[in-house]
Amino acid sequence: MADEQRGTDGAVRERVKPKKQDPTLYKVVLLNDDYTTMEFVIHVLETVFQQSPAEAYRAMMQVHVNGRGIAGVYPWEVAETKVETVTSMAREAGFPLRAALEEG
């Protein structure tokens, strides 16, 4: 009877455990610019987002052709860290590559 308790009216009431809610997921979006090389974008996708060379190439082409591309979808804290990592890597390499978060 660990999951039950008696109410004030003497009836046995079952404890209702709150349902665990999945965390909100955020897209990490890479934004195209005229200076960051395709090779560097592929490197970022492979190292920061653990994409295979083929996946990284496809994602890089999406960024190149459409002006933006989804690098991955993560919970807030992970997505925020990945955006900071991309920005830091790009600045250290001398590129203006930007990453953004979108709910979704």
Model-derived regions: residue spans:
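Terminal domain-initiation and capping elements
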Residues: 1-104
